[in-house]
Structure formats: structure tokens, C-alpha cells
């Protein structure tokens, strides 16, 4: 199958540091190539992939301080993908809804994975304007606020099976927080929980420009407390050890989380999770197996002992059963195949030398003059309810 993957140019594929969407695009591309598909990736020029790379900018836009507006780069990327669209059987978009107006006439050879929150009221109006666009959610909770869009599947994220090795005996003795420092991620809750249960907390997280004031005013003063260590943003090489050595991952979010990639990254390391019941969390965490889902800081403090007692071998086993990139890729291939079957034209009649009489001017003229039809000419099909012509 000839497949185009269109990724956000904000980060490289895979990202150097933080970037959940770009990671998933990378895992999907690599698995598709490994399975023998012809894959083209539209992404930033500093991306690394086994697929054919079509660069849409020199480097990831987040790393280029000269970039003040990302929209021109998205427009250029959509134009390039549209001009090349005939080369592909399927175009798989991971860029929200930017491409909808451009690819509307090609809707059935596109699919769009929604990676972000979908509870914003204006999105309902947008999807109502593009009812033909096939969409994929990454959790059922993500799509729950929407009515009307054309969902063709739900595909939870997956990781390469051997990306993160399990650590069956956590050596670090600390709790971990991994992700972004932002109001909705509630690292302040993680600090409160760790302090209450008397365990060290290590925080590996990035701070976006938009959240710098929040970090400076609200979070930085909390980092001076005993047992709290802020590491900053880490890369994939450091992630395995950071999560594997942790006794548990804290995920105290306060927003409608579409999936929560860090949850399955921790599970791949054998590390259990303590997560707040928001968004897709209950779909990802198997209660009492890979972690515990709680409603409040107080409940989290009470449950920490149960989380630490979970079997890390079983946590890893459940990851392998539910959240591998191979499973994710098979799910997407099933969706591609279903879309292509719908897009394929109706099968033509069995090959024959016969023609429809009135479609050839010379034959039609002969009929008008009373000239008999040859045997390899079929009279036009009668309209419904009219008698069919009989051969004598």
C-alpha cells in the first residue's frame, strides 16, 4: 500500500525531546515500512525515518526562534501533499483539521487521527461543515463530546515492543512525574502527594513559552521543598531509566486527557501508575493491574501503598497485550483497507467485445437508417419498468 503520513512540523519525527504526536507518527511509519508498505512522511527536515521524507521546513518549528507564525508552514505542507496526492492510496493526517478544505474532494482516501482535546464548542461547528472527512479517535472519551463527525475507528496509541525495557526491581526509590509543566498537568498535586507519603519526587518536564509565567510564579517556589527534584526535559535515552527506576508514575491531571502516552511508557517499563480520573485515563489504566485511578489528592495518598505493591511483571505483560505499535499499525491498516474498499469504483462488467449501441455514433446512425445490429452490439438498457428488447 502507498501511504502518506502528514505530521505536524512543530517537532521533528521522532521528536528530540517532548512530543507525543510526532512519536506516534514515527512508530507508525517504522512499523508500516517494516511490514513492506511504501511510506512517505511529510515532516520537518530534521526528521529521521525509514520512510521517504518530504521536508516541509528545514527544522522543527519549535526549535527555530526566527519562526513567529506556524500557519504559513502548514499551508505550504498542505499544498505539497495535495500536489502529490495521486501518488498515494491513503493520506493519513495528524495535523488537526488544517487540511479539511484542501482535501475535501479526496475525503475517502484520507484519514485524520485526532490527537488533541475535542471538547471545545467551536469544533462541533467545524466538523458539521466537513461531514465527509473520515476521523479516528485515540480514545472513546476523546470523541464523547462530539455528535455527527464521521468516525471510522478508535485506535489507542502503541509503542514498539522493545523500545523500553522493563525494570522489575525499581532501584530509585522515588515517584516520577513526566511530561509538561502546565496548569492542566497539575505537577503541584504530584508534589503534594509525594510530600504527604514521604517519598522523593523527580520531575522530568518541559516548560512551553506560554507556560513560563505559570512555572515561575506557581511551580518554581514549590521545587525548593525537601525531596523534590526538577530535572527538566529529557530525551528518549534517559526516559527508560527515569521511568524504570521509579516506584510509580504520578499522573494527577486536571483536564480531559485524550490518551496519556506517558501512561503506557511507564507500563512498558513495568512501572505502575497512579492517575486521576480525567479523560481517557480509565480506558488506559487497568484498575488494580497496571495502576489505580483516583478522584482526589486524598484518595491518591490513601492508594499509594496499593500502587507500590502491584506486580511489575504483570504491568509489563498488560502493556504487551494492549499497547504495542504492531497492534496499533494493524488497527490502522484495517481502517485504510475499509476506506479503499469504499473508494474503489464498482467492478466493470466481464470483459467483452460488445458495445452499447447508442454510445457509438456510427452504429446509432445505422440503426436510424434501419441497418441491423451486429451480434457484438448490445442495445441500450431499458429504463426501469420498460420492456427489454428481445432478440429474434
Tell me what each language-model feature is.
Residues 1-373, 380-382, 389-392:
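Catalytic cores of nucleotide-sugar-dependent glycosyltransferases that transfer UDP/GDP/TDP-activated
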Amino acid at each position: 500500500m502507498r501511504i502518506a503520513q502528514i505530521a505536524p512540523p512543530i517537532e521533528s519525527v521522532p521528536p528530540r525531546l517532548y512530543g507525543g504526536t510526532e512519536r506516534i507518527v514515527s512508530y507508525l511509519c517504522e512499523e508500516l515500512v517494516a511490514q513492506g508498505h511504501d511510506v512517505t512522511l511529510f515532516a520537518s527536515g530534521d526528521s529521521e525515518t525509514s520512510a521517504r521524507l518530504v521536508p516541509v521546513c528545514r527544522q522543527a518549528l519549535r526549535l527555530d526562534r526566527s519562526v513567529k507564525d506556524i500557519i504559513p508552514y502548514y499551508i505550504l505542507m498542505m499544498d505539497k501533499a495535495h500536489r502529490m496526492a495521486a501518488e498515494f492510496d491513503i493520506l493519513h493526517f495528524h495535523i488537526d483539521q488544517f487540511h479539511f478544505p484542501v482535501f475535501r474532494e479526496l475525503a475517502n482516501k484520507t484519514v485524520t487521527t485526532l490527537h488533541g482535546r475535542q471538547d471545545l464548542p467551536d469544533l462541533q461547528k467545524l466538523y458539521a461543515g466537513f461531514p465527509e472527512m473520515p476521523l479516528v479517535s485515540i480514545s472513546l472519551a476523546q470523541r464523547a463530546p462530539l455528535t455527527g463527525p464521521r468516525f471510522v475507528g478508535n485506535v489507542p496509541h502503541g509503542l514498539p515492543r522493545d523500545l523500553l525495557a522493563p525494570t522489575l526491581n525499581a532501584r530509585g526509590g522515588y515517584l516520577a512525574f513526566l511530561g509538561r509543566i502546565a496548569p492542566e498537568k497539575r505537577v503541584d498535586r504530584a508534589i503534594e502527594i509525594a510530600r504527604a507519603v514521604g517519598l522523593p519526587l523527580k520531575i522530568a518536564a518541559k516548560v512551553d513559552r506560554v507556560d513560563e509565567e505559570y512555572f515561575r510564579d506557581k511551580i518554581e517556589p514549590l521545587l525548593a521543598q525537601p525531596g523534590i527534584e526538577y530535572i527538566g526535559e529529557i530525551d528518549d535515552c534517559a526516559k527508560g531509566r527515569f521511568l524504570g527506576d521509579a516506584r510509580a508514575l504520578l499522573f494527577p491531571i486536571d483536564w480531559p486527557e485524550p490518551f496519556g502516552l506517558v501512561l503506557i511508557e511507564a507500563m512498558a517499563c513495568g512501572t505502575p501508575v497512579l492517575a486521576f480520573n480525567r479523560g481517557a485515563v480509565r480506558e488506559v489504566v487497568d484498575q488494580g493491574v497496571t495502576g489505580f485511578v483516583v478522584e482526589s489528592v486524598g484518595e491518591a495518598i490513601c492508594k499509594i501503598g496499593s500502587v507500590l505493591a502491584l506486580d511489575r511483571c504483570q504491568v509489563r505483560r498488560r502493556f504487551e497485550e494492549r499497547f504495542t505499535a504492531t497492534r496499533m499499525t494493524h488497527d490502522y491498516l484495517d481502517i485504510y483497507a475499509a476506506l479503499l474498499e469504499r473508494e474503489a469504483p464498482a467492478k466493470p462488467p466481464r470483459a467483452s467485445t460488445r458495445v452499447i449501441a447508442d454510445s457509438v455514433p456510427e452504429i446509432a446512425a445505422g440503426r436510424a437508417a434501419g441497418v441491423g445490429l451486429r451480434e457484438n452490439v448490445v442495445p441500450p438498457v431499458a429504463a426501469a419498468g420498460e420492456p427489454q428488447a428481445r432478440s429474434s
